[in-house]
């Protein structure tokens, strides 16, 4: 099954058998699992996941690939293919009381907004394993003070624990991307954050990192005054990249003290 990659869909197909096996080993699918694969593409990972005996829901936007996947996997395993945009897909419609294990080689051009879309559905997700641009994985896994630390780092940490698993070179794909990729594991916290907390933390984080070269005293002006920052135990002279998730949660609580 060979498909001409479409640039507008951000298609870079994984072709390296060794990397595919590494991903499957990292996921460790079991027959009792309910898997969701985002962007199955040519089905190379799909095939290996199905061999575990797990139930697999595949979400693919490219109608030509959907048709090819249906032909290739007709009568194979427990597979259901959904033609549609993962950015608009509601996982709760297929969760039916079960938590989902989500995997995929995500299109790099929409990876960050897609991650936030999935975070909004974190209550039905058991874990996630994704191939992403290495820079995005570095941001997901960064802690306060790290070079890659930013808005994505803080918001991801609010929802889950991120773990960088391994890097993947451009030569493992067709066509070859211009960047190094990496596989990340995201495990949601036992208790997901409530919508109110997410909204407040996001407001503080966006303001802080929107002017990251400024001190919080200036970056958060109009949102929080210095008294509120001190009350939260935060130095108004600090900068966005110096604060941990706990610090941002503390600041967010000062929005409605």
Curated annotation (Swiss-Prot):
<feature type="binding site">
    <location>
        <position position="105"/>
    </location>
    <ligand>
        <name>S-adenosyl-L-methionine</name>
    </ligand>
</feature>
<dbReference type="GO" id="GO:0005829">
    <property type="term" value="C:cytosol"/>
</dbReference>
<dbReference type="InterPro" id="IPR020596">
    <property type="entry name" value="rRNA_Ade_Mease_Trfase_CS"/>
</dbReference>
<feature type="binding site">
    <location>
        <position position="12"/>
    </location>
    <ligand>
        <name>S-adenosyl-L-methionine</name>
    </ligand>
</feature>
<dbReference type="InterPro" id="IPR029063">
    <property type="entry name" value="SAM-dependent_MTases_sf"/>
</dbReference>
<protein>
    <recommendedName>
        <fullName>Ribosomal RNA small subunit methyltransferase A</fullName>
        <ecNumber>2.1.1.182</ecNumber>
    </recommendedName>
</protein>
<feature type="binding site">
    <location>
        <position position="85"/>
    </location>
    <ligand>
        <name>S-adenosyl-L-methionine</name>
    </ligand>
</feature>
<feature type="binding site">
    <location>
        <position position="14"/>
    </location>
    <ligand>
        <name>S-adenosyl-L-methionine</name>
    </ligand>
</feature>
<keyword id="KW-0963">Cytoplasm</keyword>
<dbReference type="InterPro" id="IPR020598">
    <property type="entry name" value="rRNA_Ade_methylase_Trfase_N"/>
</dbReference>
<feature type="binding site">
    <location>
        <position position="39"/>
    </location>
    <ligand>
        <name>S-adenosyl-L-methionine</name>
    </ligand>
</feature>
<dbReference type="Pfam" id="PF00398">
    <property type="entry name" value="RrnaAD"/>
</dbReference>
<dbReference type="InterPro" id="IPR011530">
    <property type="entry name" value="rRNA_adenine_dimethylase"/>
</dbReference>
<keyword id="KW-0698">rRNA processing</keyword>
<feature type="binding site">
    <location>
        <position position="60"/>
    </location>
    <ligand>
        <name>S-adenosyl-L-methionine</name>
    </ligand>
</feature>
<comment type="function">
    <text>Specifically dimethylates two adjacent adenosines (A1518 and A1519) in the loop of a conserved hairpin near the 3'-end of 16S rRNA in the 30S particle. May play a critical role in biogenesis of 30S subunits.</text>
</comment>
<keyword id="KW-0949">S-adenosyl-L-methionine</keyword>
<keyword id="KW-0489">Methyltransferase</keyword>
<comment type="similarity">
    <text>Belongs to the class I-like SAM-binding methyltransferase superfamily. rRNA adenine N(6)-methyltransferase family. RsmA subfamily.</text>
</comment>
<keyword id="KW-0808">Transferase</keyword>
<keyword id="KW-0694">RNA-binding</keyword>
<dbReference type="InterPro" id="IPR001737">
    <property type="entry name" value="KsgA/Erm"/>
</dbReference>
<dbReference type="GO" id="GO:0003723">
    <property type="term" value="F:RNA binding"/>
</dbReference>
<dbReference type="InterPro" id="IPR023165">
    <property type="entry name" value="rRNA_Ade_diMease-like_C"/>
</dbReference>
<dbReference type="GO" id="GO:0052908">
    <property type="term" value="F:16S rRNA (adenine(1518)-N(6)/adenine(1519)-N(6))-dimethyltransferase activity"/>
</dbReference>
């Amino acid at each position: 099954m060979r498909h001409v990659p479409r640039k507008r869909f951000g298609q870079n197909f994984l072709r390296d058998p060794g990397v595919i096996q590494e991903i499957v080993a990292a996921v460790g699918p079991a027959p009792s699992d309910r898997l969701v694969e985002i962007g199955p593409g040519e089905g190379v990972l799909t095939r290996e996941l199905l061999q575990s005996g797990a139930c697999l829901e595949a979400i693919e936007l490219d109608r030509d690939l959907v048709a090819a996947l249906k032909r290739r996997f007709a009568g194979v395993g427990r597979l259901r293919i959904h033609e549609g945009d993962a950015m608009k897909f509601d996982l709760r419609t297929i969760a039916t009381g079960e938590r989902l294990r989500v995997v995929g080689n995500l299109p790099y051009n929409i990876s960050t907004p897609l991650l936030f879309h999935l975070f909004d559905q974190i209550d039905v997700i058991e874990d996630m394993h994704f191939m992403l641009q290495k820079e995005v994985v570095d941001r997901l896994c960064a802690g306060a003070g790290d070079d890659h630390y930013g808005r994505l780092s803080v918001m991801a940490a609010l929802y889950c624990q991120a773990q960088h698993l391994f890097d993947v070179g451009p030569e493992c794909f067709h066509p070859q991307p211009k960047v190094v990729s990496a596989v990340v594991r995201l495990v949601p916290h036992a208790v997901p954050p409530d919508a109110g907390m997410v909204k407040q933390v996001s407001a503080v984080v966006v303001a802080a990192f929107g002017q990251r070269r400024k001190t919080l005293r200036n970056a958060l002006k109009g949102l929080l005054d210095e008294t509120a920052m001190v009350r939260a135990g935060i130095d108004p002279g600090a900068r966005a990249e110096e604060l941990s998730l706990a610090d941002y949660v503390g600041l967010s609580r000062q929005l409605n003290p």
